[in-house]
């Protein structure tokens, strides 16, 4: 039964990260999606989520593991060293820092890791462990719901810029066709559906093998320079050092009827859908770019606040 939960978490991660950005609008519904994207996102979400619960959940680790997720854009896709989108003016020490900030501090932490796990916790469990951790993010305690509604609206706007309406409706229908029956699954604690023990170690090994394979199989001629690879390794070391040594209050793991959360999730979806429908009829590229820049700025500030507080402890 655990495997079914894992497949659904992988589906959520793949869809939210790749379809919302229109990087791969077909999601997991073609050969590239099912053969490459789905294993890549599933293993990352499960392995990093499993280690998050093994080390102890707090909001800092939740975000930092999301940053680790985003670092696959170095050795697997080589985008941090040789991007095929975005400006190329912010290159230093072999790293394209605009793409680095967008992918490592914003897109992957939020859409590939945190949101999929939050949705999975909401749908498949009776606990609020991750939600309570997410509420501790900067600005979330006082304006969490407003921030989430704004994020939903801007995500819909971003989708309208990058995805034709016909493709959007196909993706949305496919998403709910898979997700709706899963509401009937038995509700457990989030800790119980994440990989642990020997299985977690095996999945970690599988993820390492995946990294080794795609390092050589995908755009190997675009590998970073010595300085670019050194920066990546140093940032990996910094992330893992912070993850292991960071200390903060852990959120309570408690069950809930989730009636309020259910209404709020529905409201977020309606805001997202409305934003898409309104903005798909006109050019909204400047606003979509503002969404990307604002989200990246927020993620960068979150990372900086974690680092500064850790150094000043």
Curated annotation (Swiss-Prot):
Give compartment(s): Cell membrane
Topology in membrane: Multi-pass membrane protein
Give the keywords, sorted. Answer: Cell membrane, Membrane, Transmembrane, Transmembrane helix
Main localisation: membrane
- Transmembrane ranges, per UniProt, are 31-53, 62-84, 104-126, 147-161, 166-185, 198-220, 225-244, 264-282, 286-308
Question: Keyword Hydrolase on this protein?
Answer: no
Q: Which GO terms describe its cellular component?
A: plasma membrane
Q: Would you tell me the protein name for this molecule? A: Uncharacterized protein AF_0692
- Organism the protein comes from: Archaeoglobus fulgidus (strain ATCC 49558 / DSM 4304 / JCM 9628 / NBRC 100126 / VC-16)
